[in-house]
């Protein structure tokens, strides 16, 4: 996998919830769903290159899949990895496109 491919596959999508919305307003922390192979350095490099911002810190956690039932069949949702990315002072990522 080339370095450009790895950058594009590292950050999957922003994770939007009430908690993450509050974090982005309060202390410029953006939350992303990232690839299972990604580590802190990979996420930092990908966000800095893709969004042209300066990253101050990255915290990563694994989210376990939840048990689900489909009638008699028991299953699980897939596990995924979440990254809390704190941006440096004066930097911001605008996903909506409004100014």
From Swiss-Prot:
<dbReference type="InterPro" id="IPR012678">
    <property type="entry name" value="Ribosomal_uL23/eL15/eS24_sf"/>
</dbReference>
<comment type="subunit">
    <text>Part of the 50S ribosomal subunit. Contacts protein L29, and trigger factor when it is bound to the ribosome.</text>
</comment>
<keyword id="KW-0689">Ribosomal protein</keyword>
<comment type="function">
    <text>One of the early assembly proteins it binds 23S rRNA. One of the proteins that surrounds the polypeptide exit tunnel on the outside of the ribosome. Forms the main docking site for trigger factor binding to the ribosome.</text>
</comment>
<dbReference type="GO" id="GO:0019843">
    <property type="term" value="F:rRNA binding"/>
</dbReference>
<dbReference type="GO" id="GO:1990904">
    <property type="term" value="C:ribonucleoprotein complex"/>
</dbReference>
<dbReference type="InterPro" id="IPR012677">
    <property type="entry name" value="Nucleotide-bd_a/b_plait_sf"/>
</dbReference>
<dbReference type="GO" id="GO:0005840">
    <property type="term" value="C:ribosome"/>
</dbReference>
<comment type="similarity">
    <text>Belongs to the universal ribosomal protein uL23 family.</text>
</comment>
<dbReference type="GO" id="GO:0003735">
    <property type="term" value="F:structural constituent of ribosome"/>
</dbReference>
<dbReference type="Pfam" id="PF00276">
    <property type="entry name" value="Ribosomal_L23"/>
</dbReference>
<dbReference type="GO" id="GO:0006412">
    <property type="term" value="P:translation"/>
</dbReference>
<dbReference type="InterPro" id="IPR013025">
    <property type="entry name" value="Ribosomal_uL23-like"/>
</dbReference>
<dbReference type="InterPro" id="IPR001014">
    <property type="entry name" value="Ribosomal_uL23_CS"/>
</dbReference>
<keyword id="KW-0694">RNA-binding</keyword>
<keyword id="KW-0699">rRNA-binding</keyword>
<protein>
    <recommendedName>
        <fullName>Large ribosomal subunit protein uL23</fullName>
    </recommendedName>
</protein>
<keyword id="KW-0687">Ribonucleoprotein</keyword>
């Amino acid at each position: 996998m080339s370095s450009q491919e790895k950058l594009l596959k590292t950050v999957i999508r922003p994770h939007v919830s009430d908690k993450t919305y509050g974090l982005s307003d309060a202390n410029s922390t953006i939350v992303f769903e990232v690839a299972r192979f990604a580590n802190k350095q990979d996420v930092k490099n990908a966000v800095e290159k893709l969004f042209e911002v300066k990253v101050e810190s990255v915290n990563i956690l694994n989210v376990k899949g939840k048990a689900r039932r489909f009638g008699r069949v028991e299953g699980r949702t897939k596990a995924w990895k979440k990254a809390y990315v704190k941006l440096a002072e004066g930097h911001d990522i605008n996903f909506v496109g409004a100014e």
